[in-house]
């Protein structure tokens, strides 16, 4: 197996003036190009991990490695050049008068030559489907469009890792769908590692692997299917399950045979059709 591109080993962290660890002996990893979802209730430690990965916080103990770099004050900027973050509130992320100015802002801070900057801005906006809005004011965009521009700003920096810190939690269903589809396409085209911090369990279904956090520790880990086959264990720590899992549970409770756990409505319909055809 290839070496993990993102790695935390026995990481501990607690905030000032608190005795309880926000992150306690956490060891997790992600491969290049993998989509990993971190889920958990408020206070589970998932957002603290996001800040640790980007060097916004430093662990009290343990190791954090991104690519070839181990997180330290000496190489913090090497880490940040590899990791881009998209935050919860899109309105708090804009600094430019126009969409293209905003996407260019990070490149200017990195001293990218003008010609290269123009190419990267155009490419990033094309990738998220926002090139036609290049001269628009960010404030006039919808929530989903704003987050797509925020993603373009991160993409223009050409990071190896993108962290989505509750990036869809303030969006309506349409905006959420736009952003998740953008991330899916971007990951496939650029081979970027995606780490999504979320409490939206339907969003988790996009991930290759899920890490469930509880009280600062790793509670469980597996594919979305493996995790949601243990629906009762999720509920025991205050988490729900996606709608598609609830639907299967209700069908079973109503006397219908649904077969193995599936993660999409299409797959469930196919499974029900096959089972019905056999009877």
Swiss-Prot record:
Binding site for ATP: 40-47
BP-aspect Gene Ontology terms: cobalt ion transport
Annotated SUPFAM superfamilies: P-loop containing nucleoside triphosphate hydrolases
The entry's keywords: ATP-binding, Cell membrane, Membrane, Nucleotide-binding, Translocase, Transport
Membrane topology (UniProt): Peripheral membrane protein
Taxonomy, superkingdom: Bacteria
GO-annotated cellular components: ATP-binding cassette (ABC) transporter complex
EC number: 7.-.-.-
PROSITE patterns hit by this protein: ABC_TRANSPORTER_1, ABC_TRANSPORTER_2, CBIO
Signal sequence annotation: none
Predominant place of localization: membrane
Compartments it resides in: Cell membrane
Domain ABC transporter, chain residue ranges per copy: 6-240
Record-linked InterPro entries: AAA+_ATPase, ABC_transporter-like_ATP-bd, ABC_transporter-like_CS, ABC_transpr_CbiO/EcfA_su, ECF_ABC_transporter_ATP-bd, EcfA_1, P-loop_NTPase
Entry's Gene Ontology molecular function annotations: ATP binding; ATP hydrolysis activity; ATPase-coupled transmembrane transporter activity; cobalt ion transmembrane transporter activity
Subunit structure: Forms a stable energy-coupling factor (ECF) transporter complex composed of 2 membrane-embedded substrate-binding proteins (S component), 2 ATP-binding proteins (A component) and 2 transmembrane proteins (T component).
Family: Belongs to the ABC transporter superfamily. Energy-coupling factor EcfA family.
The protein's role, per its UniProt record: ATP-binding (A) component of a common energy-coupling factor (ECF) ABC-transporter complex. Unlike classic ABC transporters this ECF transporter provides the energy necessary to transport a number of different substrates.
Protein name, entry field: Energy-coupling factor transporter ATP-binding protein EcfA1
Species this protein is from: Listeria monocytogenes serotype 4b (strain F2365)
């Amino acid at each position: 197996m290839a070496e993990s591109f993102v790695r935390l080993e026995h990481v501990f962290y607690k905030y000032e003036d608190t005795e309880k660890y926000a992150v306690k002996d956490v060891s997790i990893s992600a491969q290049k190009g993998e989509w990993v979802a971190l889920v958990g209730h408020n206070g589970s430690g998932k957002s603290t991990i996001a800040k640790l990965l980007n060097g916004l916080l430093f662990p009290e103990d343990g190791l954090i490695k991104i690519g070839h770099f181990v997180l330290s004050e000496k190489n913090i900027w090497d880490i940040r050049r590899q990791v881009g973050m998209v935050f919860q509130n899109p309105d708090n992320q804009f600094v430019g008068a126009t969409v293209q100015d905003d996407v260019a802002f990070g490149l200017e801070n990195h001293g990218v030559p003008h010609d290269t900057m123009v190419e990267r801005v155009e490419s990033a906006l094309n990738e998220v489907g926002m090139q036609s809005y290049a001269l628009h004011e960010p404030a006039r965009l919808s929530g989903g469009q704003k987050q797509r521009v925020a993603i373009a700003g991160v993409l223009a920096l050409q990071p190896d890792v993108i962290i989505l810190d509750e990036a869809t939690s303030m969006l309506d269903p349409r905006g959420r769908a736009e952003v998740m589809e953008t991330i899916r396409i971007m990951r496939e085209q650029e081979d970027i590692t995606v780490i999504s911090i979320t409490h939206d369990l339907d969003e988790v279904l996009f991930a290759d692997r899920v890490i469930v956090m509880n009280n600062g520790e790793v509670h469980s880990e597996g594919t979305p299917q493996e995790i949601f086959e243990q629906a009762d264990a999720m509920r025991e720590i205050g988490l729900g399950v996606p709608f598609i899992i609830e639907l299967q549970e209700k069908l079973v409770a109503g006397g219908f045979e649904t077969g193995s756990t599936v993660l999409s409505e299409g797959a469930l319909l196919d499974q029900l059709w096959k089972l019905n055809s056999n009877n």
